[in-house]
């Protein structure tokens, strides 16, 4: 049986559960796929060229995580779906010798919310994940605000119709979303007292990090604010990515069940 290689680019990457859940699916669905897939973590130096690495490693597909999602958008031969709007790519697939970029973070995040009725969201951070979430939340009709420590990247969110801030707005939000990398450094993304104010009036504190109780989520727990980590989003976006890797042979709900069973 033919062997195909896949992977996930990131820095850091040691924490990623993507290899675990994708390899479970390549094993489960190898008969339907007609090939044996292997998916591995790829620690990418910050100055690396993603496309060169992808081709050099002979990959058929890859996921992209922090801090490369915006750079991945720039190196694709084609961009499809909501990735065109959000300027960030988390899924790369080699299709007819062209490197095609997709974004499954956007829908993956929305599906992980479970259909709850939220009206407003505050996104902390302005990177590739924040862009994907803002696009999807705007599409779903929410009022979206973005808070970032600097003006870097905020022009994108302004064009999208989001309210943008460099200082914490004095408003209440249903969703408070940590899309920064602060949790990977075991830090809060924002002043503790300011966060407390948001959590006390919010409906859900959501951290894109997963696998441990982050300082962000720990604070929400302390205040008895409902909270959620990024595990659900990871599995949904990975299921949607796997569907792309399989050329739509395996629909994402089937993939989701396998991934959920191993993580």
UniProtKB/Swiss-Prot annotation:
Pathway: Metabolic intermediate biosynthesis; chorismate biosynthesis; chorismate from D-erythrose 4-phosphate and phosphoenolpyruvate: step 4/7. SUPFAM superfamilies: Aminoacid dehydrogenase-like, N-terminal domain, NAD(P)-binding Rossmann-fold domains. Keywords: Amino-acid biosynthesis, Aromatic amino acid biosynthesis, NADP, Oxidoreductase. Disulfide bonds: none annotated. One of its GO terms (biological process) is aromatic amino acid family biosynthetic process. GO terms for molecular function: NADP binding; shikimate 3-dehydrogenase (NADP+) activity. Belongs to the shikimate dehydrogenase family. This is Shikimate dehydrogenase (NADP(+)).
């Amino acid at each position: 049986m033919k062997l195909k290689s896949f992977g996930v680019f990131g820095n850091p990457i040691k924490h990623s559960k993507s290899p675990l859940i994708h390899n479970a699916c390549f094993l489960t669905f190898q008969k339907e796929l007609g090939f044996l897939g292997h998916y591995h973590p790829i620690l990418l130096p910050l100055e690396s060229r993603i496309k060169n690495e992808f081709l050099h490693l002979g990959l058929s597909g890859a996921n992209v995580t922090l801090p490369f999602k915006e750079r991945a958008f720039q190196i694709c031969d084609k961009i499809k779906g909501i990735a065109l709007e959000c300027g960030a790519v988390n899924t790369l697939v080699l299709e007819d010798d062209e490197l095609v970029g997709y974004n499954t973070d956007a829908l993956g995040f929305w599906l992980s919310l479970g259909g709850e009725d939220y009206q407003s969201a505050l996104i902390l951070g302005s990177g590739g994940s924040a862009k994907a979430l803002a696009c999807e939340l705007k599409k779903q009709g929410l009022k979206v605000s973005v808070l970032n420590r600097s003006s870097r990247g905020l022009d994108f969110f302004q064009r999208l119709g989001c309210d943008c801030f460099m200082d914490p707005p004095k408003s209440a939000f249903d969703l408070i979303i940590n899309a920064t990398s602060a949790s990977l450094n075991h830090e809060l993304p924002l002043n503790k007292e300011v966060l407390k104010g948001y959590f006390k009036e919010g409906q859900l504190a959501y951290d894109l990090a997963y696998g441990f109780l982050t300082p962000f989520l720990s604070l929400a727990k302390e205040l008895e604010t409902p909270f959620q980590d990024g595990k659900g989003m990871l599995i949904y976006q990975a299921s949607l990515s796997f569907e792309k890797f399989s050329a739509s042979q395996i629909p994402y709900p089937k993939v989701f069940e396998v991934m959920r069973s191993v993580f």
